[in-house]
Amino acid sequence: MIYEWVPSGKPKEVRKISLQSSPGIMKLSPFPEKELGLQPGKEYFLQVVIHCDPDNPSGDLVDEASIEVVKMPASVQSKLNRAANSVEKANIYAEAGLWYNALDEALKLAQVSKLGEVGSTLLKDLAKWEAPKTIPELPPKQREAIEKRIENLKQIADSAR
């Protein structure tokens, strides 16, 4: 599910997507190419639910994240225009903190349902980038969620090559 944060109330549902799960890395494009997707300058809330047992919904795995969609900075676009391949593009995106774009480029280099070497490295880098956010000033629940996400990223990076 993708929701848009609405300042004056309840998050607005933007898209609900159902997928048939398969082993390994699954790539999802929530919007058709011709459809306008998430808008720069807006903040969204993503929720992924994996139904492990249809008869036991309390056992579902749930993860959530907030993302802010930003306009592509001109300096990043300029570097991308000069990039020779997907490895360079993935690194440019990662250096700019555009992790979804970076992973999208990395997956172009990997076998189907695999993360690949570049993708694995990116996830490890993302885990390092997330680590400073576990500072003691955060509420325990938020800090624990970030710590869990970091461990999950490391585990995926090591197992899905």
Residue ranges and their predicted role:
Residues 81-161:
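Alpha-helical protein-protein interaction scaffolds
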Residues 45-46:
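Hydrophobic beta-strand segments within extracellular beta-sandwich modules
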